[in-house]
Structures are given as structure tokens and as C-alpha cells.
Amino acid sequence: MTQSASLELRRRSFLVWCGGLGLGSGLFPGALWAQSNGSPESITSAMIDSAARLAGLHISAVDREEMVAGINANLAGYEALRKIRIDQNVPPPLYFNPAVPGQTFSNERTPFVRGARSNVRRPQNLEDVAFWPVTDLSQLIESRQVSSQELTRMYLDRIRRYDPVLHCVVTLTEELAMEQAAQADREIAVGNYRGALHGIPWGVKDVIAKRGYRTTWGSEAYREQTLDLDATVVARLEEAGAVLLAKLATGEIARGDRWFDKQTRNPWKTDEGSGGSSAGPASATAAGLVGFSIGTDTTGSILGPSKTCGISGLRPTFGRVSRHGVMPVCWSLDKVGPICRSVEDCAIVFEAIRGPDNLDLAVVDMPFNWDGNRSLENLRVGCLQDAFGDDTDANDTATLESLRNLGVELRPLRLPEHAGMDALQMLLVDEAAAFDELI
């Protein structure tokens, strides 16, 4: 911490203490701070008396002596607390539940039903499958037309070829990937097929921990950071048999698409950024460098880059996926979710990562009833009425029209009038507080 920053911290703490005495307004706090010359440890009864006179107050000698002891003792305590470092992965003692009091939910659980499958065949050139969705890639692996090792090598080759332009990979986990792919092939060969993600190569946003590899949070301040744990989402995808190819780029401290000295690029328009902060997952998935990826979202960090790069991103409801091992930005808004090349891919990945782990107490045990064959007729979809008008992006308008043609019932919605920048400003303060050690 710089000397000026430390001085400002002490000044704020000092003003807080004065406020607790009912002296937080008016001239008194500022006058007393000036009397102390920025060194609250040296405050004396005479300083308080002078400041009180300037502020038009009378404080008795007995009260002044009590204030001297209280101010100095409290400021020393604030300094001691400041030196205690709480690890970023330590959750607060209170946790947020977005459910409205009295609201009830159905606990009916039905089997996960994948959509109708097409008969996929291995192409002559394996790289032709680079952009295939997981629903098709999984059929190639399950039928043993393609091995996980073949698929993994193909994606690794594409990463080496295209990442120098896209800047979407922070750390390549090649050795781990080949080990996991070989294990998947051995299991599948003896009939131990775990499901649609078995043997599928994927990438994870670099705010999510994987033991043995850097977790940089996209910041020079944490460039060599390693965390001795696997995030719950990583552990669950490994249980599903997925193959981790890379730690993918995040904007610095999960903000934007710039990290270190690079900017992650949109594969379809490489002179532009891919959006943030799940910049790497969106870029890599859209460019066919991974089968799918995992991102995080606090204020649009899954949805924004997914739209920019033209892919499917799912920002789950808060409390559906554990954030254990994930860099916190805002404890009541952070969410972890899939970025894929189809909606059903998102459903498949979400099914694998959702649910309680007894490590993130905000996660609820709620069913996820997916039927990939269900008709969309009579499905109610809300749309923000104010977001569509004469200047609306043509693709957004086309999306609404496509939904109507599928039989979806569109219901116009309006956000509360107080929503917007005021709420965002509060969130930005919360985000800054999460990284006060950098101040």
C-alpha cells in the first residue's frame, strides 16, 4: 500500500469513529484531522479542544480525554485488522438466497432426456468436426469412431495454430489433457462409458482453480499464483470424464477482455475484442479450439462474449452451481456456467456441474428437468420491451421472429425504474472491496 493510500485509509477510519460519536457531520472531523497532521496516533486533548472551537462545539475535558483514548485505540485496531489477509476463497458467514420469502418451487424430478440423435459419421478429415456440438462429438466417441486422444490432439493443434491471433489461452494443460484422454479411451474400450462429456476436450476460464496449474485471474498481480485445490466445477467435469485442454483468458480481475499485455479476439472479426470477461472461453469455443468451455458471470460476463462471438452461453440462476475455487467478484451475484455451440450442449454441461457440494452454502438442491424433444409451442419467453425498437440490432429482431415462428409465446417485460446504473455503481464498489489488497 502506498503512503498516500494508507493515509487515506486512516482518515476514513477516523471519520467513521467520529461518526459513531455523532460527530460525523459538520466541521469537527475535518478540523481534528488537520490538527493531527494526518497522524491520528498523536491526537491530544488540546487538539480536540481546538477542533471543537473551530466547529463551534464545546467538549468537556473529561469527554476529550475519553475521546483521545477511544480514537487512538480504535485506529490501532483498524490498522491491525487491515494487516489480516483473508483468502479470496473464504466465503462470508452470511450467504444470499434470491428466492422471495414465501415463494415455493416444484421439487418434481424427471429424467434428463437428450434430443433426437442423428447418425453421425467420422469425416475423412477429423478437423471437420472442430465446430461440431457436444451432442455430435459424444456420438463419435461413444461409438468409438474417434478416440478421445485423437480429438484432443486435433484441438491442441488448432490451439497452437490460432491462439497467436486470438490470445484466448493463458496456460495449455497438454500433459494433463493427454493423460485424461488416454484414461477415457481405456474406460470406454471396456464399456465404462460415463456419458455425453466422457472424452470431450474443454477449457476453463482462468478465474477457476485447477490444482498444479496457474490461476492468474488475468492480472499481473497474480500472474504466478497457484491454488492447491480443484474448483468444484473442475472436479465435477473430471468426474464426467471431460478432458481439460487449457486455462482460458479472462479480462483482468474478471473485467473486460484485456489481460497481461494482450486482448482476446473475436474469431469472426479479429480486429475486435471478444467481449468480457469470459473472453477466452467464448473465443475458444467459437473458434473450434475446444468442445465446450466454462465461464463466470457477475454482470454479463457469459452472456456478453457469447453474443459477440455468436455462440450459446448459459448464465444460471444464482445458487445453482458451486463457486468453490472460483475467484469472487460479488458474493451475491457471481455465477458459473457453460459456453457451448448449442443450447442442448449447455444443458448437458449444466447437468454435470449443478447442485450442492457443501462448500458453497448458497447452492440449492433444485431439479433440472430437461427434455430435448419437447416442443416449444406455448413456451412463455419474456423479452425486455424497451430493448427492442427502431435501432435494435437486426440479429436480435430476427431472434424474436424465429421464436414466434416456433410457437413461443413472447411476453413483454419492463425492468423496475430504479434498475440500471445506480445498482451497477453499488456493485462496482463491492467488486473493488473484494480486491482492497491491491489498493
Which residue ranges define each predicted feature?
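Glycine-rich, small-residue loops and helix-cap segments
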Residues: R144, G199, K205, E239, ...
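A short core secondary-structure module
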Residues: T317-F368
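A structural signal for well-ordered alpha-helical segments within the folded catalytic domains
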Residues: T135, Q149, A231-A235, V343-A347, ...
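Short glycine/serine-rich loop/turn segments
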Residues: L197-V336, L384-D386, M421
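Short, well-ordered beta-strand elements within core beta-sheets of diverse protein domains
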Residues: D136-S143, Y222-Q225, D334-R341
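A generic structural motif
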Residues: A240-A242, S342, G407-R411
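Amidase signature
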Residues: M1-N192, A352-I439
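Alpha-helical scaffold segments in soluble metabolic enzymes
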Residues: M154, Q183, T232, R236-E239, ...
